[in-house]
Amino acid sequence: MIRLSLPRWLRRLAWLLLALVVVALGILLGRAFEARGKPELMPWHRLVLAAEVHADSLPAQARWADYLAREQRLFDELRSALAAAPVSGRLRYEVDSHIGPAAAARDWNRSFESTPPAPRGGVLLLHGLTDAPYSVRGLATLYEQAGFAVIAPRLPGHGTIPSGLLDVRWQDWRAVVALAMRELRARVGPDRPLHILGYSNGGALALDYTLDALDADGDALPRPQQLVLVSPMIGLRPYAGLSRWLPLFGGIEYFEKSRWLDILPEFNPFKYNSFPVNGAVQSYLLTTRLQARLLALASSGRNQRLPPILGFQSVLDGTVSSHAVVHSLFEMLPANGSALVLFDINRASLLADMFKVDAANALDVLHDDRPQTYRVDVLGNADPATLALVERRYDAGARDAVVRPLQLAFPPEVYSLSHVALPFACDDPLYGMEPRMDEDFGIRLGTLRLRGERGALVVAADQFSRLGCNPFHAYLRERIAQTLPPPPASGAGAAPSP
């Protein structure tokens, strides 16, 4: 018998790799046991809705009407499934719940659309991860008033139950984006502008689609002429990539909770609180692909074909990487009229001296005095002694700022904006600090003022204290309006708003 003698270094390497695998499996198994201590899974964490759309079940010649018909079947199935597994209680999905739209009201968990008689353009609005089309409905009115056709699709896995994100893939979202853009082009005609507005994960999808459209032949994928990105998900925290391994043992019923990062009560009518690992994994796969494509585009010089991008980003963002928005997106852009609005922290807040060093220096990390190919607008305190707001504008190629006072101010209790705050006005009936009363969804998250002993709730206190609306929403709308074509001259027959 011939015996193979491996070099000593190779044997040591093999043993080291084996040891690392054993340690990794031990850590994942320990995490699976730890996950068993999470709250109990409910029907909305386990149900599988067969009518949900996936890319491989969407025919190549599918139309927008087909998607809406499939969505109707999905919500019919959802109602039947929840009725067959009733759970007593007052929260969302529970039998005594009043959380959600009234029976006769529009369900903002579903896709919505509007088309005026003579559209001046079209806009696709893409919501974020765990969200629903509700998160872009406020900004949709801006485009409707400008005579634009509007389509806001419900992306697969969203708007129904949290388990919808257990098996969704980012390719499913991409397929629906392409379908909706083709419908939008058909509605507005070949010579009208198309815009895409993406919030959070929707921002990543907007960019990914745009890159696909640049590479597509002919009119297979209509190209947008303008992108608006609100808190765009360009990059995630480094540990997000490791999360794909967390549910390794999740296929075993005993460890099924390891498929979830959060298992929480559902009290938001238009957003999931519970969050499966797969949702984070799909966003990570999408954003890593996107960053690589943007870098390759800039390196080849083909970034000149990109449309102008208007971005809005809080310097403090607990969901996405603000650093990636600047360095992986905007620094990859040509001089094409793009602009980035940064919302600074409130340096006149009573809490200003309590900021962590990283938070206090967040703006300096994102913006310095180097000339850029894009315009930068920093919204912040006029000085550290006042709540009054100014815009510091750095034009493309400029080192010095042009300062413009604004008729805006930080609310005294707000020390910063947040990832989730930007698209919502402060009179939003769900998230607003001063909500309109013309709509009632059974809860007003923006006005909750909870007090009690710490550690008593299964929901972390910061979920209620996180700012959910934008005190500077009027500025955001004004800047978006500047990307729209000017209204027709008097007497030219402007298209009426739907």
Residue ranges of model-derived segments:
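Serine-hydrolase catalytic core
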Residues: 113-116, 271-456, 470-478, 482-488
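Active-site signature of alpha/beta-hydrolase-fold catalytic machinery across serine-
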Residues: 138, 208-212
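Gly/Ala-rich beta-loop-alpha elbow adjacent to hydrolase catalytic centers
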Residues: 197-206
